């Protein structure tokens, strides 16, 4: 049975909503008057939550969350893997299996639009500093390979309208509204990106369908 069309006023589903980028997505959405459903593995403390947001506890690797997606117009995935020696060696399959389960739930509920966080470094970037290429990239290899596999998964999915946001090195600093958005390659001097600027861009990608 074909799903009923969903209006632009319908809520957005944000996964990984309790993380740094996820929280900034919620703040930007509320500021713009956009309704959101915030999905998070471990719910933030009440004092850390964004006002006027519906929070739902969800383990994307194990839970059935299709019913909670009903009526949403799009999905924003701010799922991410915290870096540590153990996750660098053997990262949990959050980008691959987690995204696959998001896509399955979207298919079951008639949602076709998703924006995810990947990384600029899944592709060679001529403008990045030498120290990053020599130290950080090797340490992040397994996580970056999983991000690349996630993008391949999205590319193969039928009927899916997807965008992978590929930020540079993320910083926990205030919003500037000056993010430089390009295709494939980082712009010169744009090695670093703020969580809040990434969040605003991801929200724009959904709202403008870009």
Give a label for each model feature:
Residues 151-173:
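Conserved beta-loop-beta element that borders a ligand/cofactor-binding pocket
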Residues 174-179, 205-210:
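Glycine/proline-rich active-site loop of Rossmann-fold NAD(P)-dependent oxidoreductases
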Residues 146, 165, 189-203:
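Substrate-positioning beta->alpha
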Residues 11, 18, 35-37, 85-86, ...:
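Conserved Rossmann-fold NAD(P)-dependent oxidoreductase catalytic core, especially the SDR/UDP-sugar
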Residues 73-74, 112-116, 163:
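Conserved catalytic-site loops of classical short-chain dehydrogenases/reductases
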Residues 40, 118, 166-169:
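Conserved SDR Rossmann-fold cofactor-binding beta-strand/turn motif
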Residues 12, 38, 44-101, 105-108, ...:
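NAD(P)H-binding glycine-rich loop region in Rossmannoid oxidoreductase-like domains
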Residues 10-32:
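N-terminal Rossmann NAD(P)H-binding glycine-rich loop of SDR-like oxidoreductase domains
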């Amino acid at each position: 049975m074909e799903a009923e069309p969903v209006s632009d006023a319908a809520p957005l589903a944000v996964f990984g909503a309790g993380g740094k980028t996820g929280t900034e997505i919620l703040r930007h959405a509320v500021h713009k008057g956009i309704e959101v459903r915030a999905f998070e593995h471990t719910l933030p403390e009440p004092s850390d939550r964004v006002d006027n947001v519906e929070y739902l506890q969800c383990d994307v690797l194990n839970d059935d969350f299709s019913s909670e997606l009903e009526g949403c117009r799009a999905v924003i995935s701010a799922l991410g893997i915290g870096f540590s020696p153990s996750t660098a060696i053997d990262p949990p399959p959050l980008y691959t299996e987690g995204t696959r389960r998001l896509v399955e739930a979207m298919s079951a509920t008639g949602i076709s639009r998703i924006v995810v966080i990947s990384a600029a470094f899944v592709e060679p970037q001529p403008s990045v500093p030498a120290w990053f290429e020599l130290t950080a990239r090797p340490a992040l290899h397994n996580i970056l390979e999983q991000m690349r596999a996630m993008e391949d998964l999205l590319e193969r999915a039928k009927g899916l309208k997807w965008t992978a946001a590929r930020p540079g090195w993320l910083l926990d600093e205030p919003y500037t509204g000056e993010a430089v958005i390009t295709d494939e390659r980082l712009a010169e001097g744009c090695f670093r990106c703020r969580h809040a600027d990434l969040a605003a861009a991801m929200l724009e990608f959904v709202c403008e369908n870009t």
